Amino acid sequence: MSDMRSPSQGLNLTDSVYERLLSERIIFLGSEVNDDVANRLCAQILLLAAEDPTKDISLYINSPGGSISAGMAIYDTMVLAPCDIATYAMGMAASMGEFLLAAGTKGKRYALPHARILMHQPLGGVTGSAADIAIQAEQFHVIKKEMFRLNAEFTGQSIERIEADSDRDRWFTAQEALEYGFVDHIITRAATITNGEAQ
């Protein structure tokens, strides 16, 4: 991937930084999750997986969450990729950010010491005619149940506990997130990680 290691002409400093990180198999979710962000992350995951399906991808997350459909597109692409995807919470991993953090490869999910993780019920607004609202509400109920099931699978908690704990905003410190099962390790230095594994 030598062409990716040379900054492209016309890129600003921020673009060059993210391009350099990409060349090191590091991708970054540092904003609200929307369709544009999801398309970019999915493309990056697919590119890196095609380039070397045996090497880990590192996904750093500092996000307030966002669109359910966009987040699920990222999740499905993570599952599709043959390589392990290590996830790192830094700053805040809230809502869909928490979901993607916990969806990382088991044993390779990390939180920085002062990261905060937020779990709550998926949020969705419904508009339109009464019939449209009923259809949207039914679809929202389906995806909410699926996210509860997946979060239970990620964390090892029961679906019932996930539902109860998601009823209102619930914040976790890094240590609490570790105990709950969102992450596997709390790290303070990159040197403690070798080949995606905490030492």
Swiss-Prot record:
Q: Which family does it belong to?
A: Belongs to the peptidase S14 family.
Q: What Gene Ontology cellular component terms go with this record?
A: cytoplasm; endopeptidase Clp complex
Subcellular location(s): the record lists: Cytoplasm
Gene giving rise to this polypeptide: clpP2
Query: Which InterPro entries does the annotation name?
Result: ClpP, ClpP/crotonase-like_dom_sf, ClpP/TepA, ClpP_His_AS
Catalytic residues, per the record, are 95, 120
Q: How does it assemble?
A: Fourteen ClpP subunits assemble into 2 heptameric rings which stack back to back to give a disk-like structure with a central cavity, resembling the structure of eukaryotic proteasomes.
- Classification via PANTHER family: ATP-DEPENDENT CLP PROTEASE PROTEOLYTIC SUBUNIT
The record's catalysed reaction(s) read: Hydrolysis of proteins to small peptides in the presence of ATP and magnesium. alpha-casein is the usual test substrate. In the absence of ATP, only oligopeptides shorter than five residues are hydrolyzed (such as succinyl-Leu-Tyr-|-NHMec, and Leu-Tyr-Leu-|-Tyr-Trp, in which cleavage of the -Tyr-|-Leu- and -Tyr-|-Trp bonds also occurs)
CDD domains hit by this protein: S14_ClpP_2 (cd07017)
Protein name stated in the entry: ATP-dependent Clp protease proteolytic subunit 2
Give its E.C. classification number. 3.4.21.92
Q: Which UniProt key words apply to this protein? A: Cytoplasm, Hydrolase, Protease, Serine protease
Choose any GO biological process term that the UniProt entry carries and state it. protein quality control for misfolded or incompletely synthesized proteins
Q: Record keywords: Transferase included? A: no
Q: What does this protein do?
A: Cleaves peptides in various proteins in a process that requires ATP hydrolysis. Has a chymotrypsin-like activity. Plays a major role in the degradation of misfolded proteins.
**What superkingdom does the record give?**
Bacteria
What SUPFAM superfamilies does its record include?
ClpP/crotonase
The record's GO molecular-function terms, alphabetically, read: ATP-dependent peptidase activity; ATPase binding; serine-type endopeptidase activity
